[in-house]
């Protein structure tokens, strides 16, 4: 592990996670380069702010489920290479039904340099503490469509309210939202704003 980084569950005790890119359940359809274990890594500063967010969410009856944190540069390169491949339709319906995979970059869903590689970005959602069920957000994680935008039309009032709740929790815990993805937040005062790391998650 790089100095300054930690497994988030070692700091944010009791947090739930499902490291999608370590599994077959992601838009590439297979585990992604650089993810060798199903755990989530981030900077210590990210972990401390997430702990604050977890505590704030709990006062409202919610918990945090994490999908991705630190992302090795090799994983980003894997995304870029995948986006350049001919369409095979294996994941299109589930993740990008209304665009071509070649448009993922131009539309802002995939970037050649990711804030995740700096170690202080997080992808997450809320779940109800009383039932353990994920709250409805109007689209799935990594759904590359306008429906995933914070200002999306066509989602229910409850889904919009849930997005606002997550955003309020995160912004009050030191994070900034990304307008195109309701699940993506970056630490406002990140410790390595100009560094992109490539050590594997293991």
UniProtKB/Swiss-Prot annotation:
Active site: residue positions: 181 (proton donor/acceptor)
GO biological process: cell wall organization; proteolysis; response to antibiotic
Protein keywords: Antibiotic resistance, Cell wall biogenesis/degradation, Dipeptidase, Hydrolase, Metal-binding, Metalloprotease, Plasmid, Protease, Zinc
CDD domains: D-Ala-D-Ala_dipeptidase_VanX
Assembly and binders: Homodimer.
UniProt binding sites for Zn(2+): 116, 123, 184
Gene: vanX
Organism from which the protein derives: Enterococcus faecium (Streptococcus faecium)
Catalytic reactions of this protein: D-alanyl-D-alanine + H2O = 2 D-alanine
A GO MF label: D-Ala-D-Ala dipeptidase activity
Site (Transition state stabilizer) residue list: 71
Stated induction or repression of this protein's expression: By vancomycin, mediated by VanS/VanR.
Keyword Metal-binding appears in the UniProt entry: yes
Cofactor: Zn(2+); Fe(2+); Co(2+); Ni(2+)
Miscellaneous: Does not hydrolyze D-Ala-D-lactate, which remains intact for subsequent incorporation into peptidoglycan precursors. Production of precursors ending in D-Ala-D-lactate instead of D-Ala-D-Ala decreases affinity of vancomycin for the peptidoglycan chain and leads to vancomycin resistance.
InterPro entries: A_A_dipeptidase, Hedgehog_sig/DD-Pept_Zn-bd_sf
Gene3D superfamilies named in the record: 3.30.1380.10
Entry EC number(s): 3.4.13.22
Activity versus pH, per record: Optimum pH is 7-9.
Cofactor binding, note field: Binds 1 zinc ion per subunit. Can also be activated by other divalent cations such as iron, cobalt, or nickel.
Protein name stated in the entry: D-alanyl-D-alanine dipeptidase
Similarity comment text for this entry: Belongs to the peptidase M15D family.
Free-text activity regulation comment from the record: Inhibited by aminoalkyl phosphinate analogs.
UniProt key word Hydrolase: yes
Function according to Swiss-Prot or TrEMBL: Catalyzes hydrolysis of the D-alanyl-D-alanine dipeptide.
């Amino acid at each position: 592990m790089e100095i300054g980084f930690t497994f988030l569950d070692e700091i944010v005790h009791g947090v739930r996670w499902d490291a999608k890119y370590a599994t077959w359940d992601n838009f590439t359809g297979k585990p992604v380069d650089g993810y060798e274990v199903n755990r989530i890594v981030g900077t210590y500063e990210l972990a401390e702010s997430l702990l604050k967010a977890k505590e704030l969410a709990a006062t409202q009856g919610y918990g945090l489920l994490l999908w991705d944190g630190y992302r090795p540069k090799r994983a980003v390169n894997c995304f870029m290479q995948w986006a350049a491949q001919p369409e095979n339709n294996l994941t299109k319906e589930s993740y990008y039904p209304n665009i071509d995979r070649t448009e993922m970059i131009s539309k802002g869903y995939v970037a050649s340099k990711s804030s995740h590689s700096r170690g202080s970005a997080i992808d997450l959602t809320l779940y109800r503490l009383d039932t353990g069920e994920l709250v409805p957000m109007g689209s799935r994680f990594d759904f590359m469509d306008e429906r995933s935008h914070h200002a999306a039309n066509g989602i229910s009032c409850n889904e919009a309210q849930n997005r606002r709740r997550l955003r309020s929790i995160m912004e009050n815990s030191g994070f900034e939202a990304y307008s195109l993805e309701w699940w993506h937040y970056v630490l406002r005062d990140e410790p390595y704003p100009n560094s992109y790391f490539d050590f594997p998650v293991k």
